[in-house]
């Protein structure tokens, strides 16, 4: 079990994990969302590619995360590998990379993500509305408290 740096050859796997996971973060929303593949998302894909990306590789890529400065920009685990510590390992690796003042953004109703981040000391510092593929979604900024 190892977290390693992303390689360009991982891109198809990262996109597949995103495709299998993205809509899960919106499952508790009341609005209907249309999935947009990662490489077609003109906001999220460039943000991902300008970040430091890490993959959890245990003979297969099971998840990935991305950090840019102190901002954690992505943490996705393939559905069949959830609840096995993959997300925690990726988060711990990214926290070392992001240093003090780490922050991130989540869908407000993504309860699983909120619980994970709160267990590491993140607190909600603001709430706002953003969108996914043109449809409004309530979101939160979470910051790591010292």
Task: For every predicted segment, state its role.
Residues 15-44:
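Conserved GNAT-fold acetyl-CoA-binding loop/helix
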Residues 88, 109-126, 135-138:
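Conserved active-site alpha-helix within GNAT-family acetyltransferase domains
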Residues 97-109:
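Conserved GNAT acetyl-CoA-binding A-motif
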Residues 42-55, 71:
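A short helix-loop-beta-strand connector motif used in the catalytic cores of GNAT acetyltransferases and
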Residues 55, 59-76:
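Conserved beta-strand in the GNAT
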Residues 80-81, 85-94:
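Conserved acetyl-CoA pyrophosphate-binding loop and the N-cap/start of the following alpha-helix
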Residues 72-82, 106-107:
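A short, internal acetyl-CoA/4′-phosphopantetheine-binding micro-motif in the GNAT/acyltransferase core
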Residues 2-16:
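A short beta-loop-alpha structural element at the N-terminal edge
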